[in-house]
Amino acid sequence: MTRRDTTRVIRPATGPERTCKSWLTEAALRMLMNNLHPDVAERPEELVVYGGIGRAARDWESYDKIVETLRRLEDDETLLVQSGKPVGVFRTHADAPRVLIANSNLVPRWASWEHFNELDRKGLAMYGQMTAGSWIYIGAQGIVQGTYETFVEMGRQHYGGDLSGRWLLTAGLGGMGGAQPLAAVMAGAACLAIECQPSSIEMRLRTGYLDRSTDKVEEALAWIEESCAAKTPISVGLLGNAAELLPELFKRGVRPDLLTDQTSAHDPVNGYLPAGWSLERWHAMRDQDPPQVAEAAKASMAAHVKAMLDFQAAGVPTVDYGNNIRQMALEEGVTNAFDFPGFVPAYIRPLFCRGVGPFRWAALSGDPEDIAKTDAKVKELIPDNPHLHNWLDMAGQKIRFQGLPARICWVGLGDRHRLGLAFNEMVAKGELKAPIVIGRDHLDSGSVASPNRETEAMRDGSDAVSDWPLLNALLNTASGATWVSLHHGGGVGMGFSQHAGMVIVCDGTEAAAKRVARVLWNDPATGVMRHADAGYDIALACAREKGLDLPGIL
């Protein structure tokens, strides 16, 4: 089992020529490779895409076998992938998914990091995060609009909708957290982001998500102060450890206008540097003594959360951004760790009630012009949404593509299928140079059960009910998605979430149009269904408006 290979540089093919037998399998191959593009993946030599140890394949041998199998897969066959390893090819039919993926799923009683890490060391499992192991990660852009929407809503609730002259304090500049600086600036706020790994800061600078960086606290604060005074937002990366710096900043009397965190606290062994430790010690001890690392990391998380609670008590709007750091602190004795809310119940749930979530697409041509054309098509089909148009304009100006050109765009039930059908027609007419892949984050309205994040504080108390993502995956499979994934532990770590993903390919054919119409209606409709079942009035109204048949609910 080879987990590290520094000799490989993976980039997807581009253009109209295929190496697979159909565009459906070619799309899966290109998106798998795109996840490992050096401008996309955090540690591509280790197959790690983002989120601590979120991988695209279990090991390099498995990666090679997946590539080989996709290239020979027939139009009526389906590849099964078990925790990043290809395990079977079976005859199905043309409208069935070409790939079905299950990553890091464990029987609940055994669903702990300790048991998973034991399996991982034996080569029996792989952590897929959300979009790492499901081959639809598009770099930091994949989370940037959701982060932007959250910051805009924070500004609306706390500052009358105006974040100019204000600033956000946060930590974590990995594959997810790396979206924060750009999202804050796009929302009108300056951002100071603490990050312990120089490589993560360098990647955000290189890809345009961060404006400048320093390892000096005074310099960072001076830049933020100047930015706020001029009402010209900038983003600053500060090299350091959040567990050390947040308490220090509070003691100094520093008071940001907004506070959150996106360190990889979900994984106490691989994701969070203990206070007082060097990177070298951390990397060595992760292999030598994982329990000691976890113990030290969780103690540091407790200090981190205590500082966040101090800021909140001082009047700073504070929110958990879904990395499970509150749970880790609670287990370390911080009994009031959940006094600050998660971002979904605080700011995002009304969108989920209408099936609105992180719709994304990528241009298999590799040509940015194809994304520009699809952006224009979105505006044409949804003409009466100035907020969405503003987002697309900003994205076109400020977001640099990582790997294959792609776009994230939060839309919901009734719009997703219209956009998909329009993209498919553009491919059919030759307006786009190659097919389009449409997917989404597993963080969506009907595809996840995560009591400390997406399903926190559900109205009916159904936070931990995970039937919903299972039903979502089953329905997407029956509807004809090109590949479907079912994962455990993404975002918040082992034992705390189950979630499903889907991808559909627009190859310009009539058969694709039928699949697109089914999948991109049914997928967001499950989100409306899930929230209607929980008793949310917005979801119930949406279900009635869209004519959903929900016999046990309506």
From Swiss-Prot:
GO terms for biological process: L-histidine catabolic process to glutamate and formamide; L-histidine catabolic process to glutamate and formate. SUPFAM superfamilies: Urocanase (SSF111326). Keywords: Cytoplasm, Histidine metabolism, Lyase, NAD. Pathway: Amino-acid degradation; L-histidine degradation into L-glutamate; N-formimidoyl-L-glutamate from L-histidine: step 2/3. NAD(+) binds at residues 51-52, 129, 175-177, 195, 241-242, 262-266, 272-273, 321, 491. Its EC number is 4.2.1.49. HAMAP family: HutU (MF_00577). NCBIfam families: hutU, PRK05414.1. Belongs to the urocanase family. Catalyzes the conversion of urocanate to 4-imidazolone-5-propionate. This is Urocanate hydratase. The lineage of its organism: Bacteria, Pseudomonadati, Pseudomonadota, Alphaproteobacteria, Caulobacterales.
